[in-house]
Swiss-Prot record:
One of its GO terms (molecular function) is glutaminase activity. Part of the FGAM synthase complex composed of 1 PurL, 1 PurQ and 2 PurS subunits. Its EC number is 6.3.5.3, 3.5.1.2. One of its GO terms (biological process) is 'de novo' IMP biosynthetic process. PROSITE patterns: GATASE_TYPE_1. This is Phosphoribosylformylglycinamidine synthase subunit PurQ. It comes from Ruegeria pomeroyi (strain ATCC 700808 / DSM 15171 / DSS-3). Part of the phosphoribosylformylglycinamidine synthase complex involved in the purines biosynthetic pathway. Catalyzes the ATP-dependent conversion of formylglycinamide ribonucleotide (FGAR) and glutamine to yield formylglycinamidine ribonucleotide (FGAM) and glutamate. The FGAM synthase complex is composed of three subunits. PurQ produces an ammonia molecule by converting glutamine to glutamate. PurL transfers the ammonia molecule to FGAR to form FGAM in an ATP-dependent manner. Pfam families: GATase_5 (PF13507). The active site is at residues 86, 194, 196. Pathway: Purine metabolism; IMP biosynthesis via de novo pathway; 5-amino-1-(5-phospho-D-ribosyl)imidazole from N(2)-formyl-N(1)-(5-phospho-D-ribosyl)glycinamide: step 1/2.
Amino acid sequence: MRAAVVVFPGSNCDRDLAVAFEQAGFDVSMVWHKDADLPQGIDIVGIPGGFSYGDYLRCGAIAAQSPICKAVVAHTARGGYALGVCNGFQVLTETGILPGALLRNAGLKYICKTVGLKVETSNSVFTEGYNAGDVIGIPIAHHDGNYYADDETLAALKAEDRIAFTYTDNPNGARDDIAGILSANRRVLGMMPHPERAADAGHGGTDGVALFRALAGALTPA
């Protein structure tokens, strides 16, 4: 299994995400934002948290125009898998790979703490290691994590069982408490919380491990 982790100027969770993939059994390649292509044979692309391009203009807006993001868009259009965490979720919405947008937190403050997440669906390669209804503890660290989508988009996300995670105690004003969503083909997950920061007992929690193990199990060649 092979994963590629994209690195932008201002990324600061790329190595954490790479380690979480590696611990689950993936061979990981770090891919620079100026690269025009992803490595051959990649099973999944990880877009990490951080402050790509300093969050200028809008979080993820400049990163979405980078050469590597054109390759990521093509990868997902072919049915490839992708995981966007925090700033990575913002990039996925800015590229149009996922619907909606991430707005400034309702309280207008940066939030860094562990929050409760409810698993809304186990019907994806990302969440099949959990049971629907499980409540897990995953850290957040963001200033612009307030998920917004119009009523039509929200209705579609609900009808198609594409809301992956919701907050048990909404920290940022996200519509319908949404913390993470899936693409229409269920092969792309964007989420504001950081599962890679809950993948080592020495760092305070392991509730994110099941996500990476589920990915490894699903993407391991038969």
